[in-house]
Curated annotation (Swiss-Prot):
Family: Belongs to the coagulin family.
Disulfide bond listed as a keyword: yes
Pfam families: Coagulin
Keywords: Disulfide bond, Hemolymph clotting, Secreted
Protein localization: Secreted
Known tissue expression: Hemolymph.
Provenance organism: Tachypleus gigas (Southeast Asian horseshoe crab)
Cysteine-cysteine disulfides: C8-C167, C10-C95, C60-C161, C65-C121, C75-C168, C88-C140, C127-C170, C134-C172
Protein name, as recorded: Coagulogen
């Protein structure tokens, strides 16, 4: 396994390449802020998010772990893919990013507040290289897609809805 491959989001460096970590103090601040949002919302009906009254969470809360599915973060529909001859094998797993770089390249703390009941999951689609599905002259390439995640701005002590890139699918390209 490539330890420097993204753990969740396309532009997130792997363990060896990480320069930023989210401290416990920051996690506590976020938990408290999310708990406040949950309190404002009161009791939630079945199937409704505790957070849907908050504009940022309403716009951006689609990746809540309890409701997200792998197909939500695929770049395209399931096989057969019309625009690619074939697809390399893909391993999917859900992943909870705690930080990332936005589509504009800015470092952000992504909201994960398990105690308050709000966790965000994206599905990571990793190509299994070394497959012969691409024939002898092709190679697996990764598509990119965007997801909108709830982030926390420590300076302003507020939530934002921001765009991140995820990798998904592994089409074959002949080069």
């Amino acid at each position: 396994d490539d330890t420097n491959a993204p753990l969740c989001l396309c532009d997130e460096p792997g363990i060896l390449g990480r320069k930023e970590f989210v401290s416990d103090a920051t996690k506590t601040i976020i938990e408290k802020a999310v708990e406040e949002v949950a309190k404002e919302g009161g009791v939630s009906g079945r199937g409704f998010s505790l957070f849907s009254h908050h504009p940022v969470f309403r716009e951006c809360g689609k990746y809540e772990c309890r409701t997200v599915r792998p197909e939500h973060s695929r770049c395209y529909n399931f096989p057969p893919f019309i625009h690619f001859k074939s697809e390399c094998p893909v391993s999917t797993r859900d992943c909870e990013p705690v930080f990332g770089y936005t589509a504009a390249g800015e470092f952000r703390v992504i909201v994960q507040a398990p105690r308050a009941g709000f966790r965000q999951c994206v599905w990571q689609h990793k190509c299994r290289y070394g497959s012969n599905n691409c024939g002898f002259n092709g190679r697996c390439t990764q598509q990119r897609s965007v997801v909108r995640l709830v982030t926390f701005n420590l300076e302003k002590n507020g939530f934002l809805c921001e765009t991140f890139r995820t990798c998904c699918g592994c089409p074959c390209r002949s080069f």
